């Protein structure tokens, strides 16, 4: 019996020590994984700034979602639609025309675009057409957070 407890304790220590290293490549509870990143659909409306702050507080490296391919955009729609139905979600671009900024809030390059119009802050539609629209940053919308595993 003592040996069983010792082995069980040892396995628990190993599991806990590996948990923070990315060894399991698993996303936290309520987060979904895609291509080495974790995504969280948040069904609480916030301004762009408050949504970005919320995402950065959830996980180290967390930000509003950045999208780098049509496949990732499709994944995002399939993830968000069942939770948010036909909604608009904040994405990680803001003040891009005022500051001539061409990167996502997570610092990654803007290498995939699906513009509908120019904007101060960027929202995406969850209805499957993957269009991005302009929106006043002070409006409140649902959002998706993302971080790299």
Swiss-Prot record:
GO terms for cellular component: extracellular region. The keyword Signal applies. It is found in: Secreted. Expressed by the venom gland. CDD domains: CLECT. Residues 1-23 form the signal peptide. Residues 34-146 form the C-type lectin domain. Agglucetin specifically causes platelet aggregation and surface exposure of integrin alpha-IIb/beta-3 with a GPIb-(GP1BA-) dependent manner in washed platelets. It binds to human platelets in a saturable manner, and its binding is specifically blocked by anti-GP Ib mAb. It regulates endothelial cell survival and promotes angiogenesis by activating integrin alpha-v/beta-3 signaling through FAK/phosphatidylinositol 3-kinase (PI3K)/Akt pathway. Pfam families: Lectin_C. It comes from the Eukaryota. This is Snaclec agglucetin subunit beta-2. PANTHER family: MANNOSE, PHOSPHOLIPASE, LECTIN RECEPTOR RELATED (PTHR22803). The keyword Secreted applies. Disulfide bonds join 27-38, 55-145, 121-137. Belongs to the snaclec family. Heterotetramer of the subunits alpha-1, alpha-2, beta-1 and beta-2; disulfide-linked. One of its GO terms (molecular function) is toxin activity. Keywords: Disulfide bond, Hemostasis impairing toxin, Platelet aggregation activating toxin, Secreted, Signal, Toxin. The lineage of its organism: Eukaryota, Metazoa, Chordata, Craniata, Vertebrata.
